[in-house]
Amino acid sequence: MNQQGLEDIEMARQMTTNGCYNKAFDLYIMAFEKNVAIKSAYESEFRMVMTQLNEVLMTANKMEDVFINYTRALMTYPNSIIILNDMGKFLFKCGFYEKAWEHFEEALNLDYTFVNAEKNFNSLKNLLVERWHFRMLNDKVRNEAYRAAIHETVIPRVDTILDLGTGTGLLTVYASECSPRITTACDGSKVMSDLATAITQENGCEHCIIVNKLSTEMQLHEAGGKRTLLLTEVFDAGLFGEHVLQSLIHAWENMLTDNARVIPSKAEFFIIGAKCDFLHKRYQLCSPIKEILNVQNMNVHVLTFDETYDCEDVHFYGDDIKYMTEAKSLVCVDFNNCQELKNLIEMDHCEVEMVVQETGEINTVIGFFNLYLTDNVTITTDPRSDRRANAWQQAIFYDKIPVQVVENDIVPMYFSLNGGKLTMYKDDTIIRISPETIRFLNDIEYVNAIAACIGTTCIYLGQMAEMSQITVVDLSPFPVFGLHLLMRGAKSLTCCAKTDSDKEFFEIVFECNNVPLSNITILIGDEWTQEGFKDEKYHAIFCNIFEVCGEIDLRLKAMAEHLKQHHLIQEGLFLPASIKLMGQIVKSNWLDINNKLYDENVSNYKISKHLNPYQVTQNFCIDFSHLEYTPLSDVCVFGTSDSTEGVEVIDVPIIKDGLANAVLCWYIIELVQDLREVTTNRKNCFIDGIVFITDPKIRVYRGQSTPVLRSVDSDGAFKLTMHLEE
């Protein structure tokens, strides 16, 4: 080997040891300039030094220097997918989205099996264009209703239009069919404004102005003067959550003529009491686990994070939901009456009396709305209606404490419009904990599976030491395993709480079960590190490596591996014993329309070519138990959580002809070797499923096999890709 440059490498290593990362970085670059042949041999350690240097610089807020370092690194290693990905992440973090896009795309063009680059690219696309844009634009019921209302209302060559929150500009395109004098469309998102500009131009919309601003930030001259007709669709599941009241009040006061009209002209929000154990378990601690934890009298609900309701596709739930009351109108508003809008936004109390239709229990409250676009055109999101628009989900008011009811009972419910957002009054004193902890504890099947392992665990540990000497780590969202061992006399427990609220709840549970807090160490949040365990050794370690969304948490995975290797007493017990990665090839129209636009659904206007570049290859938080899909393959094992880095092809047997567009993915957890397995593909599991999406669709045939690539990065991140040989 040419020795030139090697002295610089040695000096760079010395500088790194001394913490002089800047000088070390320069010395590596100097060495590579002297001797190009040595670059590949030293790329890994060079990247490590650059990472350390950039961390120091970012801490000092020297972002320009970080950018320069990445630029120099890419000049040296122009085809390094890792450096391209790292620079993309940096640009993403700094808000340079177009440049980040270029770097992720280039990394994937060099190696399409690179998992981290694809995940980062998906995250960027999700940020720039949220998935609901796809489902909304694919909703022909909504689209044709708005189109009909616009045609009914617009006076050709007379009306001037303001399209408030235009998104992709579809309503502006529909309005152009009616020859208005001029249309101004506004949106606060630069990406959506750029898309609207391209789409309106592509589809021949004349006399159209696109403004990249929220309507409430626009000046009158930017709108081109006062308008005679306002179009809007800025509604969420709770109707008012996207600040539509504030936006319309501002528009009436600043942007509209006195005799202007609004589409929709009116809106009405309804609530309905229901029994849905599936939803109840998502948001409140349920009776079975409260009995296990000995906290029967506590009302424990999910942390709200300043949200007053959640949203779900309730129409999928079928027999899992029973509507216990009639639907009752909570709010009806005329968008053409500015004073009514002002009165509504200040409403601090609204009471409705719900009439019970059958004896049973109410444990959740569902909200939906009607949009009266005109006197003749109405859209509903009523989950019971076959004519509903699926662009919007239904609102879930999750703080309703379960109540037993009898047919014809009157159940009062109280709401306010808190800052323009509907809020349901709480029934009673509520303690709040993280969604992760609620979901984990309400997964009774998993909690019972853990409990079923305790006897075997104690026998095994008893062969190592007296129970009073047993030390335990349990890094689950709630330490069910650790609590059982403490109640059997274990010496100590180290566990982790997602939030301070979780920590307080843990302490209450420990005290209710007569477990001394002096025996417990609770780590809080996500900032604790491996170093916090020092040189301690433990007899039993239980780790959770999953995020609620269904993804593997790489930080927790690395923590679990570290604890197993360095902090487990010899012959100690590590749980779970194994985790298998499972999958199945499917056809799902629902997954398709949430990720790909079809022009046939937008009246054959040319929109898909502009929106579909924002398609992603992976979706999270998928509830398989209520997902519409057709299985096309057998269920297959695609690997384990310990699968080695690289790419492996798995041949998947096909059981049904069809066009495949996704691989569903879940896990089988073996808690103790050869003793107990639990699948995560079931209703009420503590984690959701994930899907890997294929576009274009792949035709598969019964009796044949379809190859699926399992790609694993060095950190354990993985993806599945359906693959057909060219």
Predicted regions: what is each one?
Residues 2-38, 44-47, 51-54, 59, ...:
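Class I SAM-binding transferase module
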Residues 41-42, 76:
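Short coil/turn linker motifs that delimit alpha-helical repeat modules in TPR/alpha-solenoid proteins
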Residues 74, 79, 86:
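All-alpha amphipathic helical-bundle segments outside canonical DNA-binding/catalytic cores
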Residues 79-80, 99-102:
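Phosphate-/polyanion-interacting regions in eukaryotic proteins
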